[in-house]
Amino acid sequence: MIPFLPMFSLLLLLIVNPINANNHYDKILAHSRIRGRDQGPNVCALQQILGTKKKYFSTCKNWYKKSICGQKTTVLYECCPGYMRMEGMKGCPAVLPIDHVYGTLGIVGATTTQRYSDASKLREEIEGKGSFTYFAPSNEAWDNLDSDIRRGLESNVNVELLNALHSHMINKRMLTKDLKNGMIIPSMYNNLGLFINHYPNGVVTVNCARIIHGNQIATNGVVHVIDRVLTQIGTSIQDFIEAEDDLSSFRAAAITSDILEALGRDGHFTLFAPTNEAFEKLPRGVLERIMGDKVASEALMKYHILNTLQCSESIMGGAVFETLEGNTIEIGCDGDSITVNGIKMVNKKDIVTNNGVIHLIDQVLIPDSAKQVIELAGKQQTTFTDLVAQLGLASALRPDGEYTLLAPVNNAFSDDTLSMDQRLLKLILQNHILKVKVGLNELYNGQILETIGGKQLRVFVYRTAVCIENSCMEKGSKQGRNGAIHIFREIIKPAEKSLHEKLKQDKRFSTFLSLLEAADLKELLTQPGDWTLFVPTNDAFKGMTSEEKEILIRDKNALQNIILYHLTPGVFIGKGFEPGVTNILKTTQGSKIFLKEVNDTLLVNELKSKESDIMTTNGVIHVVDKLLYPADTPVGNDQLLEILNKLIKYIQIKFVRGSTFKEIPVTVYTTKIITKVVEPKIKVIEGSLQPIIKTEGPTLTKVKIEGEPEFRLIKEGETITEVIHGEPIIKKYTKIIDGVPVEITEKETREERIITGPEIKYTRISTGGGETEETLKKLLQEEVTKVTKFIEGGDGHLFEDEEIKRLLQGDTPVRKLQANKKVQGSRRRLREGRSQ
């Protein structure tokens, strides 16, 4: 009979507990079995934290790190659950004998629980008929229980102790594979719920007590050994907060933000609850601002709550969790302490309630969404924020406004920059503050952003980088209550001059500029556009005589091909390139140019750039010390080949006798602007001695056609219309004519005006400005026998200058209405009035 029991228990274990790939506990156990197989059959490798009795089936991560929660571990080899050693044999070749639940408690070493089961008269129940799951506290768990609680249980074994043990039991067999994450299982004491959590790292907890020895099969159930004694729970998180004096500040904040009631509902929450001491650490102004802002206070409260139940024993390393606020926090461990965002702050852990678990912390967690934009800066942006505060810009960032900070890292500020005149430094900082809130996902290539200083900054988006002007972003963008912050590698320098102006300003580029102008390409670099120009310094032309330069200039096609190979459409910032890989661009000449960013240096056709990212209003300049030449373009002229070979030694220039350079059309990059001006409408409202005049100003419709640069050939004799950039200037005039309104339409009009009797009639004229305005007003205040003016055209003036001068000299110009005269614009109305 005895040999049959081990065989029977092995068969039963295989039937009721097959390995399930979706069962995290079994999966980790299988890994531990594999790591221990060199020690013999059915041996599992465990990691034990040095200086403690805590043991874990190892995960891959912890196994190779040789640490858990930052503490070193040692490897133990033990029999896997359900097996035992035999004297003289390697490994664990025998299965444990099977017994009823009471007997199994002794087999697994839970002798204190076994003794208490006997004392409370529970033994008869768990030896008899039925099927039970017993979460049995280990002997160490009983030793760690509060002494007063333990004495209370021992003094009333028939009621208190029995009830406590029943609260550790389920009236059916449930193996670890059956214990699903988030389950609430009624216990055998008043159906009080047992909260089950089954974590991806293989940890299984019951009311936050970890199963340290699971799946010990019994004839009438199963025993799981746990690392602590379960306490009865019946209150919610809300109930605990309302009853706990040390959470009065948190309670007040939760009530203000309408969060407290939500913590009384069903769920599986984790609350990191700041104590009163934690709130006292906050600057009063910060706390008052947040609590006075409903959105910010709600965000603050929700940032302390997870929608999952995270027991301390489940945390074996850093992991990121999403809060109810929407942002994430990192929960980790350092020895026996829980860390939040890398900081030890948990004073008391694993306060289990009927809808979650509470960890008390000594710091208030403030999410970015509750912070002012200046508070979003981290340790690497303190130079920027300190300067913003010192120069008075921080006070200008109103809590009710919205801004974006483009914050350079600390090492972007050189000693020369910091020693600048404060007025100049303030202007530089203003270039790093935008008037609006712009998140990272709202930025796009070609976007124009306006700073609080009135400067316009351009956005460039590349495969692996986002840049604004000359500086590219680093990771760390955040959004706060009244703005966003983006981190930049360098100080942003807005462009002030065009490509041509930059070349003209810098004497290093005088030779290249003279060749560019000789090739009739000056206009290209003065027009608005987006270009990348690779500019050779004068050193690139050392050794070239004036005669050789003249030869080069005489062959305009060759010169244009060479110059345009240095120019490519689009703005490409050096730091915007993906490091270490070749970026291929097509030049305006048509051939390809190869760029690579290596060790913060831009390589152009494998030549090191001497200086990069010189920003201009219509592009960017990268400086090289060699003349560039397209390797796929042959030369067919001996003289030209000799000159080029003299200047270019890093490639072998092809020579094909008789070959000529292709003609490249002179290109103009323009932005088309169509401006439509609608004539003003004039309305007359009668019924008073003084006419009521309503003037509707000109309507301006501005259409901007965006897209790729337009290239076209300028033919000889063709008229080129220059687009003038900037806002059109519209002069506004008001015409007032007293008398009877006469509507002018597009048809033949005949009208005679006869003035009889002593009645004085005159036409009142008002203009929108001009040097004769005051004199004209004076004239109209004097007695005038008769003034008649027919309005022709639509220029907005009643009289020409010469007519006004004659009028001032005493002449009275009179013009008769002419037949067959069509008035321009069917919507024009003439207003005449009469004044006596």
Curated annotation (Swiss-Prot):
Residues 1-21 form the signal peptide. It is found in: Golgi apparatus; Secreted; Secreted, Extracellular space, Extracellular matrix. It comes from the Eukaryota. Glycans are attached at residue 599. GO terms for molecular function: cell adhesion molecule binding; heparin binding; metal ion binding. Gene3D superfamilies: FAS1 domain. Residues 40-94 form the EMI domain. The modification S-cysteinyl cysteine is found at residue 60. InterPro entries: Adhesion/Biosynth-related, EMI_domain, FAS1_dom_sf, FAS1_domain, TGFBI/POSTN. GO terms for cellular component: collagen-containing extracellular matrix; extracellular matrix; extracellular space; neuromuscular junction; trans-Golgi network. Residues 97-230, 234-365, 368-492, 496-628 form the FAS1 domain. Widely expressed with highest levels in aorta, stomach, lower gastrointestinal tract, placenta, uterus, thyroid tissue and breast. Expressed in the kidney. Expressed in the lung. Up-regulated in epithelial ovarian tumors. Not expressed in normal ovaries. Also highly expressed at the tumor periphery of lung carcinoma tissue but not within the tumor. Overexpressed in breast cancers. Gamma-carboxylation is controversial. Gamma-carboxyglutamated; gamma-carboxyglutamate residues are formed by vitamin K dependent carboxylation; this may be required for calcium binding. According to a more recent report, does not contain vitamin K-dependent gamma-carboxyglutamate residues. Keywords: Cell adhesion, Disulfide bond, Extracellular matrix, Gamma-carboxyglutamic acid, Glycoprotein, Golgi apparatus, Heparin-binding, Repeat, Secreted, Signal. One of its GO terms (biological process) is positive regulation of smooth muscle cell migration. Its main location: Golgi. Disulfide bonds join 44-80, 69-333, 79-92, 208-311, 467-472. Induces cell attachment and spreading and plays a role in cell adhesion. Enhances incorporation of BMP1 in the fibronectin matrix of connective tissues, and subsequent proteolytic activation of lysyl oxidase LOX. Homodimer. Interacts with BMP1 and fibronectin. This is Periostin. It comes from Homo sapiens (Human).
